[in-house]
């Protein structure tokens, strides 16, 4: 069985775009692969964080992923900072990565140009090696990523090839070269207010996204005010009708009906009826998730699952870390 690793940033409540584009697929992947889902809190502190809020977001995100259907019997879900091998591996990887490689990373270039090099943390430059460590520690064969993160996977692959070539003995590879697993087509959900840009939880216009924890009345209001067009005809056309096309994608993901079935069902009907029904479909989708989320937050079950997840993750990560330490010559002697 192949292994999948995915890191999840604890940076606010996911949107239905995150659910449709990633979380929903994770639930399916756990049935076919050996999955590790890691809440990457060490990555979060590359920018300033309020400690209490960060801890709250870590538990909240873990509860939400379990509430949508991640099964701790099938997948390992854990907190990055609770497995110290991540930081140790990150240092070994930094020492085998050039400054030039890191300065070419898009996120560092964008933020350092925006804020000036003196205004960003060193962690923003060096976090890609930590991300490489996240992946290689679990011998990941596949990493699900969006188009915006393919660059990090290329860095990971380049590093692993270089590390194995430099340190492997008798052609025995030390680390596994991961493959990119691109999300399925059609899973990109757009803003409700600007349907040509991706839905984002950091959107300053809160009407542009639906949070996984939005109340039913809020969901109905946001969908009612979603931007469409003046024709009133429900059809799928990304170029000319991006608004209604986006709503059709959401409706399809929420109900399991195909876009074609939905277009046929609403033939001759207006946007008002369509939006009202879509809102109820989204409410029905999120309601059981929200109930389970609240149960987990209020119980000891969540912490028990995360404790066990960290323990299972350590068993695998520490073995890989020891291979890396042995390879580069750390410690007084080779350990197994």
Swiss-Prot record:
- Which organism is the protein's source? Enterococcus faecalis (strain ATCC 700802 / V583)
Q: Which family does it belong to?
A: Belongs to the class-I aminoacyl-tRNA synthetase family.
Q: Keyword set for this entry?
A: Aminoacyl-tRNA synthetase, ATP-binding, Cytoplasm, Ligase, Nucleotide-binding, Protein biosynthesis
MF (Gene Ontology):
ATP binding; tryptophan-tRNA ligase activity
Q: Where does ATP bind?
A: 9-11, 17-18, 146-148, 189, 198-202
Extract the PANTHER family matched here. Answer: TRYPTOPHAN--TRNA LIGASE, MITOCHONDRIAL
- Documented EC number(s): 6.1.1.2
- Function comment: Catalyzes the attachment of tryptophan to tRNA(Trp).
Binding-site positions, L-tryptophan: 134
Q: Which domain of life is it from?
A: Bacteria
Q: Where is this motif: 'KMSKS' region?
A: 198-202
Q: Which HAMAP family match?
A: Trp_tRNA_synth_B
Please state what the protein is called.
Answer: Tryptophan--tRNA ligase
PROSITE patterns xrefs: AA_TRNA_LIGASE_I (PS00178)
Gene Ontology terms: cellular component: cytosol
Q: How does it assemble?
A: Homodimer.
Transmembrane: present as a keyword of the record?
Answer: no
Q: Which gene encodes it?
A: trpS
GO BP terms:
tryptophanyl-tRNA aminoacylation
